[in-house]
Every structure is written in C-alpha cells, then in structure tokens.
Amino acid sequence: MIVLHARDCDPKACTALRAHRMGLVELTRHPGDVPTGAVVLDPTVEKALSREDRDAALERGLVAVDCSWEHVHRYFGPLRRRCRHRILPYLIAANPVNYGKPCKLSTVEALAAALYILGFRREAEEFISRFKWGPAFLELNRERLEAYRRAETSAEVVRVQEEFLPDGL
Ligand SMILES: C[S@@+](CC[C@H](N)C(=O)[O-])C[C@H]1O[C@@H](n2cnc3c(N)ncnc32)[C@H](O)[C@@H]1O
C-alpha cells in the first residue's frame, strides 16, 4: 500500500506517518511515484470501490492521499488520468479526530476499509489493529463492511449502501 503524502497535516496526529514508521505502508511525496493503473482512494469521485478493483489493487497497488480535508480537492487531479479513482461507500470514522463522522476516514481507516471490501479481511484486521482505535473502527462498521465485501460490483455496493444511509443523506 502506498500513501502519497501532501505534508499539510499535523505530523503528530498523522496516521499515514505512523503507519509508515511501523513499516505498514510505503510513503512518497511525488505523484509520479504512484503506479499507473493503481486504485486510488478518492473521496471526491462518484464510483464506489468494489471487488471489481481487486486485481488492479493487487497488481498495481492501493493508494491513499494523506492531505488535510480542507485541501482534498487539490491533490487527486494529477493522478486521475492514469489511475482508478474510487470512493469508499458509507462508513463511520472511529479515529479520535473525526470520531462518529460519516465518510471522513483517516488514511489508515480508508486503507483498512478498502482491504476489507476487496476481500482481504484478515489483512485489514491485522493492519488496523496496530492502532488503538482500530478495533473500534471495525466493530462500528462490521455490518456495513461485511455487506460491501459480499457485493460483486460497484453498482451493487452503491445499492447495498442505500440500506445504511441515514434518512436525508
Ligand atoms: C483527507 S486524508 C486525511 C488524513 C488524516 N489527516 C490522517 O492523519 O489520517 C484521508 C485520505 O484517506 C482516504 N479517504 C478517507 N475517506 C475516504 C472516503 N470516504 N472515500 C475514499 N477515500 C477516503 C483518501 O485517500 C483521503 O485523502
């Protein structure tokens, strides 16, 4: 797994830097280092991640972009022409900064959720359990993650998501 790091976060609270220090992810500051065809977790697009992206993630890589939420629209543009950009379906954050907020996941929550949905459940659990609040993220979202994992296509993930959306979203 690769994190493109924008250096605009608080380094003490940055989950990507912590994951890198633990040897769990590769870190780069250069968009050119992201492999062509990689699956990029991008909260600004419409197409949802699903098992259909599993081969691309395995062969080309799974990528998150660690930047501040205020600047999230700036960083994905340069990759969009050559990578598969995917949004995660409805999930709730359990990290201390955004606890309880829908869809605003930390970088490591996003990567763990992606692993889970792509069918790498054990790897997702091992990865997120390295963080104090990781197991809480899984418990809070277990039913949703299981349902998304079972969906075969992006369209099906979106259909399944409808069941979990609170009224008005
Ligand atoms: C905006 S950064 C914030 C990072 C935060 N400062 C941290 O320390 O974890 C979170 C990144 O995780 C991924 N991500 C988070 N929520 C997502 C979602 N709902 N859909 C797709 N990707 C998401 C994206 O790559 C996003 O840029």
UniProtKB/Swiss-Prot annotation:
Broadest EC class assigned to this enzyme: transferase
EC numbers, comma separated: 2.5.1.157
Superkingdom of the organism of origin: Archaea
Alphabetic keyword roster: Cytoplasm, Ribosome biogenesis, rRNA processing, S-adenosyl-L-methionine, Transferase
GO cellular component, one term: cytoplasm
Pfam families linked to this entry: Ribo_biogen_C
InterPro entries linked to this entry: Tsr3-like (IPR022968), Tsr3_C (IPR007177)
A single GO molecular function term of this UniProt record: 18S rRNA aminocarboxypropyltransferase activity
Reaction catalysed by this enzyme: an N(1)-methylpseudouridine in rRNA + S-adenosyl-L-methionine = N(1)-methyl-N(3)-[(3S)-3-amino-3-carboxypropyl]pseudouridine in rRNA + S-methyl-5'-thioadenosine + H(+)
Binding site for S-adenosyl-L-methionine: 15, 65, 88, 107
Keyword Phosphoprotein found: no
Primary subcellular site in the record, as a coarse category: cytoplasm
Claim: Transmembrane helix is one of the keywords in the record: no
GO terms, biological process: enzyme-directed rRNA pseudouridine synthesis
Intracellular or extracellular location(s): Cytoplasm
Described purpose of this protein according to its UniProt entry: Aminocarboxypropyltransferase that catalyzes the aminocarboxypropyl transfer on pseudouridine corresponding to position 914 in M.jannaschii 16S rRNA. It constitutes the last step in biosynthesis of the hypermodified N1-methyl-N3-(3-amino-3-carboxypropyl) pseudouridine (m1acp3-Psi).
Family: Belongs to the TDD superfamily. TSR3 family.
Full protein name: 16S rRNA aminocarboxypropyltransferase
Species in which this protein is naturally found: Methanopyrus kandleri (strain AV19 / DSM 6324 / JCM 9639 / NBRC 100938)
